[in-house]
A protein has these predicted regions:
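Acidic, Gly/Ser/Thr-rich repeat motifs that build Ca2+-stabilized beta-propeller blades
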Residues: 2-7, 21-202, 255-261, 298-329, ...
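Sec-dependent N-terminal signal peptides
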Residues: 8-14
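C-terminal motif of bacterial Sec signal peptides marking the signal peptidase cleavage site
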Residues: 16-19
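Surface-exposed loop and turn segments in beta-propeller and other repeat-based domains
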Residues: 116-128, 168-182, 220-240, 274-298, ...
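Flexible glycine/proline-enriched surface loops and loop-helix/loop-strand junctions
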Residues: 199-203, 230-233
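Repeat-solenoid scaffold signature
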Residues: 237-264
Length: 392
């Protein structure tokens, strides 16, 4: 973060604190809020999230402006895609988006324009909930131009890497696959290690099996070798007891968060610690960690997650909304506020860009949604005011 941005955030935070009767109001949902389009920021001046309290006339969902989610909504930057799942923001401000079942990778502009196909991943099995899943840029992308992807093949789930339009090279193979529970989120931490979220492959008992790569968070280097700081330095397993793991993201201090279905009709947000067991299946094993935050599955279907400042953003498929959870000084997630309820249908992925924008994908053509003629879509918004600051 630049010094200019830090100064702006400090001033704006002070204004928010002095203008509110209670610090907890910082994340209270504003029923009038709808996303406002923001163009790409200047390359030499990163811009913080907007602090305007309400949209101006003419913004989506306001009098005189287009309704959010309609053909005229300027926050929708790409349309007509087939189950966009993985997304990574490139250094030039565009986004690389992967289609789960087709294996296509496309470049999406930060303003409405046709998505440009660049390559197709070979050897893909897109049946069930498998296919081309998470994407992440190499920590040395400016030098090596490598993209990492989690994919399902006929025999396994695996992590691969490639340069755009280049050959695909396996990095980590042998992750169990299934009709469901393929997992598939990946992210690099500030330690340069690759964190891989895997599902239980439809076999819940694998999640508790320390010898299986299913139902785990894995931590490996850029070549797929176990991090020597893992609980077992010979194993890629970082944590276990995860079920149909749907989201994985990291904070700037390398705190790992996951989102996943839980027990008893609740979805979970977990703050993951090395070596911990997160209880799937059953949640009653001795020593199993309790969820850090639960959200009823009826308005959950939690999927991707992303972090900006002190706000944790989580997409919801079943609930068709975006959740924002404040993070306190220890990284503990607080009570969720919900946004974009029903505006774009089932939301699958959310990624935070360096300019403070959130990129999201919809999943309305997966058989469980109600697709519009524009689906599936990629959306780019600025977070609502106050959602990136934790209450004092």
């Amino acid at each position: 973060m630049s010094r200019t941005w830090r100064a702006l955030v400090a001033v704006l935070t002070l204004l928010l604190l002095t203008g509110c009767s209670a610090a907890a109001d910082a994340l209270r949902p504003d029923p009038t809020w709808m996303p406002q389009p923001e163009g790409p920021p200047p390359a030499d001046l990163p811009q913080p999230p907007s602090t305007e309290g309400a949209p101006s006339p003419g913004a989506p969902g306001q009098p005189g402006g287009p309704e959010a989610g309609t053909a005229d909504d300027p926050n929708v930057v790409a349309i007509g895609l087939t189950l966009p799942w993985g997304l990574a923001v490139l250094p030039d401000g565009t986004a690389l988006v992967g289609e789960r079942t087709t294996g296509r990778l496309l470049i999406v502009q930060p303003e409405r324009a046709p998505a440009k196909p660049v390559m197709r991943i070979p050897g893909l099995d897109g049946t069930g909930d498998g296919g081309l899943l998470g994407l992440a840029l190499s920590p040395n992308y400016d030098d090596d131009g490598l993209v990492y992807a989690y994919m399902t093949t006929r025999t396994d789930n695996r992590v691969v890497r490639f340069a755009l339009r280049g050959a695909v090279t396996p990095v980590l193979t042998g992750i169990p696959k299934g009709r469901t529970g393929n997992g598939g989120r990946i992210a690099f931490g500030s330690d340069g290690m690759l964190y891989v979220g895997t599902g239980d492959a439809g076999k819940p008992a694998l999640s508790a099996d320390r010898k299986s790569l299913a139902g785990k968070v894995l931590r490996v280097d850029t070549f797929g070798r176990p991090d020597r700081n893992n609980p077992d330095r010979s194993s890629p397993v970082y944590s276990l007891g995860h079920g149909r793991l749907a989201g994985l993201c990291l904070s700037g201090v390398n705190q790992v968060y996951t989102t996943e279905p839980g027990q008893g009709g609740q979805d979970e947000v977990n703050r993951v610690e090395a070596g911990r067991d997160y209880g799937w299946p059953g949640g009653t094993r001795a020593g199993a960690a309790a969820p850090d935050r639960e959200i009823p599955a009826a308005v959950g279907g939690l999927s991707g997650c992303a972090i900006i400042e002190r706000g944790l953003f989580v997409t919801s498929t079943t609930g068709r909304r975006l959740y924002a959870l404040p993070l306190d000084g220890s990284g503990q997630p607080g009570s969720p506020a919900d946004y974009l309820v029903g505006a774009y249908g089932r939301l699958r992925t959310v990624v935070a860009a360096p300019d403070g924008a959130l990129w999201l994908t919809t999943s309305n053509k997966d058989g469980a949604g109600k697709p519009t003629p524009q689906d599936d879509r990629v959306i780019r918004i600025m977070p609502p005011a106050g959602s990136t600051n934790s209450p004092a």
